[in-house]
A protein has these predicted regions:
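Residues that line or immediately flank small-molecule/substrate-binding pockets and catalytic motifs
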Residues: 2-4, 29, 48, 125-128, ...
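A short helix-to-beta-strand connector/capping loop
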Residues: 18-24, 89-93
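A structured beta-alpha segment of the ubiquitous adenosine-cofactor-binding alpha/beta core
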Residues: 23-42, 46
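N-terminal Rossmann-like dinucleotide-binding module
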Residues: 1-18, 171
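Short, solvent-exposed loop/turn and secondary-structure capping segments
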Residues: 10-11, 56-58, 79-80, 135-138
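Non-transmembrane alpha-helical segments in soluble domains
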Residues: 12, 33-36, 45, 57-61, ...
């Protein structure tokens, strides 16, 4: 399921390479609604642009589906509570399947920590350094007049670490944060935007 049918069709190539049958394709602005209405699926995995995470998850839960959702699961606190309440009322799971917490490397490292390979973990350091320059053109754009795409537009309007769980999540898991221990203080800092600012101004022709 993808907003753009061509992107959804391209995924069929992966199935073909794996010697698997073609999947049903759903596309367009409301394609996910048709997908969620099916009675032969149990779980909807959401890896769309961030603004669509909540409406797709809400639709899936309302149609009796379990939900695995990429980070962030919602764009504000009210949407978070809406998902919690909906999950509880429908008795369906709504799980944040954070790719940098549950990828093979992170799960392997967590397994090693839990089995004492590192001894008693008393200090940890994590990071997520990611140059997005090669990817800006691959993010979904809403029509020909959208020069930035959803991701660059979001970075332009918001400051700071927009998905801190990439670097912090695996460390918190290894330290059992919220599984017997908890954070008492959190300090966050960032620098001014340089490369992103230049890129936005180059694409829009406007100073930001």
């Amino acid at each position: 399921c993808d907003y753009e049918e061509a992107r959804a069709d391209k995924c069929q190539e992966l199935l073909k390479k794996a010697s698997m049958p073609k999947a049903a394709v759903y596309s367009g602005d409301k394609g996910y609604e048709e997908l969620c209405k099916r009675d032969d699926i149990d779980l909807v995995y959401i890896a769309a642009d961030w603004l669509h995470h909540f409406p797709v998850a809400k639709c899936a839960l309302e149609n009796g589906k379990n939900v695995a959702i990429e980070v962030p699961s919602a764009m504000n606190l009210q949407e978070c509570w809406d998902l919690i309440n909906l999950s509880e009322s429908t008795r369906k799971h709504c799980f944040i399947l954070e790719n940098c917490c549950y990828d093979w490397f992170e799960m392997n490292t967590l397994n090693m920590a839990q089995h004492g390979v590192f001894g008693e973990v008393i200090r940890a350091q994590g990071a997520y350094i990611h140059n997005l320059s090669p990817f800006w053109d691959h993010y979904w754009k809403n029509g020909e007049n959208d020069k930035l795409g959803w991701r660059l537009d979001y970075n332009m309007k918001h400051r700071g670490d927009v998905y801190a769980t990439h670097g912090l999540g695996p460390v918190a898991q290894a330290l059992d944060i919220h599984r017997g221990d908890r954070m008492e203080t959190l300090v966050a800092m960032d620098t001014k935007s340089v490369v992103g600012k230049e890129l936005v101004e180059k694409r829009t022709g406007e100073e930001c």
